[in-house]
Regions:
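N-terminal targeting/trafficking signals and adjacent low-complexity tails
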Residues: 1-296
Length: 296
């Protein structure tokens, strides 16, 4: 996390940025709860007890998070090291995995469904946000590393089989994988790409405008989205290539080693299922009583 780009700037001006904000109020279909949270997250602590107004305030929660941590760190980091090495991770990522072994290190976790060519652009934004926040916390004295959770266990193939890109004519173009590549009941991360992926990659570059970056980008995409590779590995490999310099740790929850580490959590959740369901129902009633919509 020593890269200057991981530093925590106090203001956009200090970062050399000129911002022209687009308020979410101007974007259709936003929920009232979301907009109220953006305006004043602290006012919603009834529903979000750990809400903060400024990101640097999160450091105060580190002792609580560390005290609640139960996973065996060495086993966790061994699994993460093996996964990220397979995906082509750089020294920065492997160094961060070693940092995570320390009992005083916290993880800043973001995540998103895996998708064709990484999916929507905000997937990359989410990943870089974790990098920036981990850098901010580390700079202020809380050891932190960025982690990105690849949501490989999702079963909704229709949501992740298509990528939308801006074509040469300035319009949106859809690039899709075949529907029959996925079998009902199979996590999308376990879908295995076949030879047709080469045609899909070619269609992408047929519609994209050419630039000085085309050859390099084509090499990255063809290396990641290759026949016989799982959808999880393809997405992970491309994301790794794109953000390799920033130390981002990728996590695939389908990995058997990680599932074994999570077994006690699943056992506890199953044991307390009635209690959890009752708590969710009670919170939904509270939200609706405050003129918000139920979240689940």
């Amino acid at each position: 996390m020593s890269s200057p780009e991981a530093a925590c700037y106090s203001t956009p001006e200090e970062a050399g940025l000129h911002l022209e904000p687009l308020p979410f109020e101007r974007i259709p279909h936003q929920t009232r709860l979301f907009l109220d949270y953006l305006r004043d997250p602290v006012a919603l602590r009834r529903f979000y007890p750990n809400a903060v107004r400024f990101h640097h305030e999160l450091a105060a929660r580190a002792p609580e998070v560390l005290a609640a941590h139960r996973t065996e760190r060495n086993a966790l980091c061994a699994a993460l090291g093996a996964l990220n090495t397979d995906w082509g991770a750089g020294a920065e990522t492997l160094d961060n995995i070693e940092r995570l072994r320390a009992p005083d290190c916290v993880a800043v976790v973001s995540g998103q469904q895996i998708g064709l060519f990484t999916g929507p652009l905000y997937t990359i934004y989410k990943a870089l946000t974790a990098v920036k926040l981990a850098g901010c916390l580390s700079q202020r004295g809380t050891t932190a590393v960025p982690v990105f959770w690849l949501a490989t266990e999702d079963h909704d193939w229709a949501e992740v089989q298509t990528a939308e890109v801006i074509a040469c004519d300035g319009r949106l173009a859809d690039i899709s994988l075949p529907a029959d590549l996925h079998t009902d009941g199979t996590p999308v991360g376990r879908v295995v790409l076949d030879e047709k992926i080469n045609d899909t990659v070619q269609r992408l570059f047929d519609v994209l405008p050419a630039s000085e970056f085309t050859d390099d980008l084509k090499a990255l995409v063809r290396d990641a989205y290759a026949p016989s590779r799982t959808y999880a590995a393809a997405c992970a490999r491309l994301m790794t290539a794109l953000v390799k310099a920033y130390g981002l740790i990728l996590l695939d929850p389908l990995d058997a080693r990680l599932k074994q580490l999570a077994a006690p959590l699943y056992t506890e959740a199953a044991r307390r299922a009635p209690e959890i369901a009752a708590a969710i129902e009670a919170r939904c009633r509270e939200l609706e009583g405050a003129d918000y919509h139920a979240q689940v």
